[in-house]
């Protein structure tokens, strides 16, 4: 502890300057540092452990000494977690030890009681000559003595554990020449770095729980290892336990290590965490930490029929709704599969194939829904156009996602279980326990993710209900403080745990690779692009990534990977450029125009294409023939405006059975002399009495004259003959009762009317006028039989192309074509989709 730090007592507020102190290892083993009586005793106690081990091995044998040191380790571990825990709890709540020292004047000069003499002697021998214990507050003196007992317990705890591990090593050193030793040594080295870096950050003050006694008036910068894991001294600070267990290859050591680590977590939960909340308040989160939870509440408040979704949480489910059938279906399916395993005993091969196929298919379904929802709002539109609400579509997605998760993990569970009970599978207990630990890590990771982003984030709510997000910023609290995408690695830890449990069976390796690949695809190619689009390109940097970026070699490797990614991206972009540039070249014939129109989608490019087509295509006429469209000055017609064609042909070319057809130029571009496609009823006679039985086609003839030299007339295509699909069309005059083309008009464009969606009432009025003009209204409702060319499908297309809103046939039929209800629905859908943008 630095001498320039200012501290103050917790209750009285007395300020003082703490003396310089040293860490545990230097205090005990550095010969240049003064040693107190207790420190000498601690050192002798540690040496006695080794002497006792050597003597005991000679006298009692290996098995007895392993039991003896296991008992010692358990004793000292309980002294640590229970003894120190109780002492700190009393000090935190009641300041028991400092108050005792004050009441009994333990550090008062002239007090000759045995306790006071011993405590004062201990501090005098420990501290430098310049330290005046009588002028310092009792809180500091008690803490300095408390450190001595902590040193004894912690060093004995460590020493007895290490001796127990040593006694559990394989008899043959050659048995340790494997991958487990390499991984174990790496974990031990990592553990050492964690402890050293943690002490660099918190110093002796926090290492010895100084804030239980007094408070420092300084800001600690929690960087380094504190960016990697929550409570690193209690979590990853015990990685060495598992590294030593791997090296030993003894599951007894692993179980002892797990027990010791578990006791440490209990110490954290019941001693440290409550004190932190009392002293510093609950852990502060970023301003957006509660946004997702608030969104869940907002959804439930605004939608009275909404209830929290069922969520798979390992071997249990949360939010089970007794009145929701899908919950029974999900749970029932999982239970049925487990019963099937025990009753039918399916083969391992069948279970593997079924698990692999199910995971593959459900991943495709989930990825497809998320991708289409992100790019097109497809899933929401699917339900909106069928008369359902936005939140209802989200509820259906929640069921799909959770059911897929339950189904695949249930199948993985029974597949692993069947593999374990297979006669050909060797169960190595150490690997099996490590596999269970990985499953526990995944369960913990999922719980932390849900705690950080709530149900809304767990079910990708920002894909479906982005309009419910009040502040669009990514959360950086909880597990997301350390990992940017924790589900990518820790989210499949349990799946790789099954690989360890089954002794690296190829089936479970294949399943783990599939799980990891699917997770990677969702995060890298779907989730990250969507997050960038919704929240901006300022990506969140996790604590682990931030720490690694501070390391030179890792930073250079990261820069190299970024360059490779940029090269790949640019190469893909350059391959696309020639195609894009080709679209910009002018089209000089009608075939090029149509290819051009297929690609161009926005309105400006569409208008340019129309100009290109009309400007470069002339009507094709026989000599002395006339074939003109009236009022073609604007080169376009807004539906359902009637179109009149004036025609004239020499008498020798005229035939009473001649007719005029309306075609999309994309269909007729291949042949200008013969029409090879059907007009599908979009045709008119040129003579009023030519085609008996085709009344609507004859009624289109408005003028007809014939003399000795020419025949001429007018034909008007109204809503009963026009196409209601936007595009570029042409009229063709056919000679006689054939498909031989005599005349072709100039191309023109058919456009949909612009409807006003300012209010449902205005839209209702305009729709009613439009449908009346095309004879598709009966009793104020849409009548799909009123105009054979204005069917329900055409009405859907009109609404989609003109208003950008889709309605399903089922919905239109459900409301019986009610224009008012349809108008209300269109405005609602449009508002929802606009809010999602």
From Swiss-Prot:
Topological category with respect to the lipid bilayer: Multi-pass membrane protein
Pathway: Phospholipid metabolism; phosphatidylcholine biosynthesis
GO CC entries: endoplasmic reticulum membrane
All ranges on the Cytoplasmic side of the membrane: 58-67, 170-173, 227-235, 344-349, 418-424, 527-837
Keyword line: Endoplasmic reticulum, Lipid biosynthesis, Lipid metabolism, Membrane, Methyltransferase, Phospholipid biosynthesis, Phospholipid metabolism, S-adenosyl-L-methionine, Transferase, Transmembrane, Transmembrane helix
Residue numbers on the Lumenal membrane side: 1-36, 89-148, 195-205, 257-322, 371-396, 446-505
One Pfam family recorded for the sequence: PEMT
Disulfide-linked positions: none
Entry's transmembrane regions: 37-57, 68-88, 149-169, 174-194, 206-226, 236-256, 323-343, 350-370, 397-417, 425-445, 506-526
Region forming the signal peptide: none
Catalytic reaction equation(s): a 1,2-diacyl-sn-glycero-3-phosphoethanolamine + S-adenosyl-L-methionine = a 1,2-diacyl-sn-glycero-3-phospho-N-methylethanolamine + S-adenosyl-L-homocysteine + H(+)
GO biological process: methylation; phosphatidylcholine biosynthetic process
Any GO molecular function: phosphatidylethanolamine N-methyltransferase activity
InterPro entries xref list: Phopholipid_MeTrfase, Phosphatid-EA_MeTrfase_fun
Entry EC no(s): 2.1.1.17
Subcellular location: Endoplasmic reticulum membrane
The keyword Hydrolase belongs to this UniProt entry's keyword annotation: no
Highest taxon of the lineage: Eukaryota
HAMAP family in the cross-refs: PEMT
Role of this protein: Catalyzes the first step of the methylation pathway of phosphatidylcholine biosynthesis, the SAM-dependent methylation of phosphatidylethanolamine (PE) to phosphatidylmonomethylethanolamine (PMME).
The family this protein is said to belong to: Belongs to the class VI-like SAM-binding methyltransferase superfamily. CHO2 family.
Name used for this protein in its record: Phosphatidylethanolamine N-methyltransferase
Organism: Zygosaccharomyces rouxii (strain ATCC 2623 / CBS 732 / NBRC 1130 / NCYC 568 / NRRL Y-229)
Lineage of the species this protein comes from: Eukaryota, Fungi, Dikarya, Ascomycota, Saccharomycotina
Gene: CHO2
């Amino acid at each position: 502890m630095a001498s320039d730090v200012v501290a103050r007592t917790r209750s009285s507020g007395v300020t003082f300057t703490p003396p310089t102190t040293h860490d545990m290892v230097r205090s005990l083993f550095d010969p240049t540092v003064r040693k107190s009586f207790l420190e000498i005793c601690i050192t002798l106690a540690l040496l006695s452990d080794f002497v006792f081990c050597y003597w005991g091995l000679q006298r009692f044998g290996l098995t007895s000494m392993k039991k003896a040191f296991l008992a010692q380790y358990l004793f000292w571990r309980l002294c640590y977690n229970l003894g120190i825990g109780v002492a700190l709890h009393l000090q935190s709540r009641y300041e028991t030890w400092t108050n005792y020292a004050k009441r009994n004047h333990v550090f008062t000069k002239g007090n000759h009681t045995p306790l006071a003499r011993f405590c004062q002697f201990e501090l005098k021998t420990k501290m430098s000559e310049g330290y005046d214990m009588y002028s310092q507050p009792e809180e500091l003196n008690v803490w300095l003595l408390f450190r001595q007992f902590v040193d004894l317990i912690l060093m004995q705890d460590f020493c007895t554990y290490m001796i127990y591990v040593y006694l559990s090593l394989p008899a043959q050193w050659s048995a340790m020449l494997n991958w487990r030793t390499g991984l174990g040594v790496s974990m031990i080295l990592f553990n050492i770095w964690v402890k050293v870096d943690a002490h660099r950050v918190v110093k002796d003050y926090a290492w010895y729980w100084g804030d239980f006694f007094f408070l420092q008036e300084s800001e600690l910068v929690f960087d380094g290892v504190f960016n990697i894991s929550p409570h690193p001294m209690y979590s990853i600070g015990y990685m060495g336990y598992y590294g030593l267990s791997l090296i030993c290859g003894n599951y007894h050591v692993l179980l002892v290590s797990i027990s010791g680590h578990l006791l440490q977590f209990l110490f954290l939960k019941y001693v440290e965490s409550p004190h932190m909340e009392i002293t510093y308040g609950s852990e502060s989160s970023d301003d957006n930490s509660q946004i997702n939870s608030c969104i869940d509440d907002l959804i439930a408040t605004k939608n009275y029929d909404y209830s929290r979704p069922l969520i798979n949480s390992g071997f249990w489910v949360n939010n089970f709704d007794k009145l929701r059938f899908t919950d029974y279906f999900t749970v029932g399916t999982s239970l049925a599969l487990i019963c099937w395993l025990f009753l039918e005993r399916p083969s391992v091969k069948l279970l593997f194939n079924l698990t692999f196929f199910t995971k593959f298919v459900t991943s495709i379904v989930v990825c497809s829904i998320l991708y289409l929802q992100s790019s097109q709002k497809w899933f929401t539109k699917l339900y909106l156009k069928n008369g359902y609400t936005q939140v209802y579509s989200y509820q259906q997605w929640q069921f799909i996602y959770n059911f897929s998760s339950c189904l695949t993990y249930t199948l993985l569970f029974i597949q692993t279980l069947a593999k374990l009970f297979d006669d050909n599978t060797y169960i190595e207990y150490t690997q099996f326990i490590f596999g269970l630990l990985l499953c526990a890590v995944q369960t913990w990771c999922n719980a932390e993710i849900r705690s950080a982003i709530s149900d809304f984030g767990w079910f990708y709510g920002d894909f479906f209900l982005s309009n419910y997000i009040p502040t669009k910023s990514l959360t950086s609290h909880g597990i997301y403080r350390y990992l940017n995408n924790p589900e990518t690695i820790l989210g499949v830890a349990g799946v790789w745990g099954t690989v360890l449990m089954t002794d690296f069976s190829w089936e479970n390796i294949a399943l783990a690779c599939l799980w990891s690949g699917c997770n990677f695809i969702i995060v890298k190619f779907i989730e990250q692009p969507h997050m960038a689009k919704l929240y901006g390109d300022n990506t969140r940097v996790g604590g682990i990534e931030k720490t690694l970026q501070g390391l030179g070699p890792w930073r250079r490797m990261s820069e190299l990977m970024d360059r490779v990614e940029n090269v790949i991206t640019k190469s893909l972009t350059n391959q696309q450029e020639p195609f894009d540039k080709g679209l910009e070249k002018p089209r000089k014939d009608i075939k090029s125009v149509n290819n051009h129109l297929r690609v161009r989608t926005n309105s400006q490019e569409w208008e340019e294409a129309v100009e290109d087509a009309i400007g470069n295509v002339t009507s094709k006429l026989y000599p002395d023939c006339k074939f003109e469209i009236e009022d073609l000055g604007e080169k376009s017609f807004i539906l359902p405006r009637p179109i009149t064609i004036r025609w004239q042909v020499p008498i020798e070319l005229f035939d009473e059975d001649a007719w005029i057809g309306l075609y999309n130029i994309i269909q007729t571009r291949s042949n200008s002399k013969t029409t090879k496609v059907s007009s599908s009823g979009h045709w008119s006679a040129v003579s009023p009495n030519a085609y008996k039985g085709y009344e609507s086609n004859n009624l289109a003839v408005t003028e007809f004259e014939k003399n000795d030299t020419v025949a001429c007339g007018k034909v008007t295509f109204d809503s009963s003959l026009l196409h209601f699909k936007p595009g570029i069309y042409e009229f063709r005059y056919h000679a006689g009762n054939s498909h031989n083309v005599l005349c072709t008009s100039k191309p023109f464009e058919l456009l949909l009317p612009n409807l006003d969606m300012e209010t449902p009432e205005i839209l209702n009025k305009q729709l009613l006028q439009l449908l009346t003009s095309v004879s598709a209204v009966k009793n104020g409702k849409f009548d799909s039989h009123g105009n054979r060319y204005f069917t329900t499908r055409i009405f859907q297309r009109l609404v989609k192309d003109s208003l950008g809103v889709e309605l399903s046939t089922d919905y239109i039929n459900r409301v019986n074509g009610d224009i008012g209800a349809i108008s209300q629905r269109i405005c609602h859908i449009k508002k929802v989709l606009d809010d999602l943008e």
